[in-house]
């Protein structure tokens, strides 16, 4: 690996780790209705499992309700089954091709559990960032050992990698803090 590409590659890997965290945090339920809450729902349709968003339109008419407008009338029971199997803790009311999902208020205890889960996701992401940093430093050591870079370059690049790691680590902290505020807001 070339020294010029190393930092860029590490940055791309760290960016992917942050995206994964973002997707995990989207799946955590806050007190407000969000269509992202249904991202994990798959529906048995046309002989395979497909995401709910490919057979219905999703909307949030108010802060406590998600509407699922199924496009094909024959798919309504499959969509209901998919929502039930996803085990989201939601009950649904079906009216023709419209499925309403009322979002119950979170208890204080459940909010605290979700905050703990968000912090766990954050810590897992930080571990990924540290592993990416470690891999980058090991690559630098190989480059130095093979006399591709000199010791000064090694120290300079390792400091840059550390700064990059710190930058992404602070992004994790701010994402977790923001999600915690969303969860704890009643």
Swiss-Prot record:
Keywords from the named record: Cytoplasm, Protein biosynthesis
InterPro entries cross-referenced by the UniProt entry: Ribosome_recyc_fac, Ribosome_recyc_fac_dom, RRF_sf
Pfam families: RRF (PF01765)
Compartments where found: Cytoplasm
GO molecular function, one term: ribosomal large subunit binding
GO cellular component: cytosol
Major place of residence: cytoplasm
Keyword Protein biosynthesis attributed: yes
UniProt GO BP: cytoplasmic translational termination
Family per similarity comment: Belongs to the RRF family.
Role: Responsible for the release of ribosomes from messenger RNA at the termination of protein biosynthesis. May increase the efficiency of translation by recycling ribosomes from one round of translation to another.
Protein name, as recorded: Ribosome-recycling factor
């Amino acid at each position: 690996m070339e020294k010029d590409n190393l930092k860029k590659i590490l940055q791309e890997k760290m960016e992917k780790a942050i995206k994964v965290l973002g997707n995990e945090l989207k799946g955590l339920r806050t007190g407000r209705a969000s269509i992202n809450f249904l991202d994990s729902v798959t529906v048995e349709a046309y002989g395979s499992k497909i995401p709910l968003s490919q057979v219905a339109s999703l909307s949030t008419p108010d802060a406590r309700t998600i509407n699922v407008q199924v496009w094909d009338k024959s798919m309504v029971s499959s969509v209901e089954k998919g929502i039930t199997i996803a085990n989201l803790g939601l009950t649904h009311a079906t009216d023709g091709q419209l499925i309403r999902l009322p979002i119950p208020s979170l208890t204080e205890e459940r909010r605290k559990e979700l905050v703990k889960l968000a912090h766990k996701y954050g810590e897992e992401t930080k571990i990924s960032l540290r592993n990416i940093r470690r891999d980058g430093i090991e690559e630098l050591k190989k480059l130095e050992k093979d006399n591709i870079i000199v010791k000064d370059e090694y120290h300079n690049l390792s400091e840059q990698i550390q700064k990059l790691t710190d930058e992404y680590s602070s992004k994790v902290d701010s994402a977790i803090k923001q999600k915690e505020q969303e969860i704890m807001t009643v």
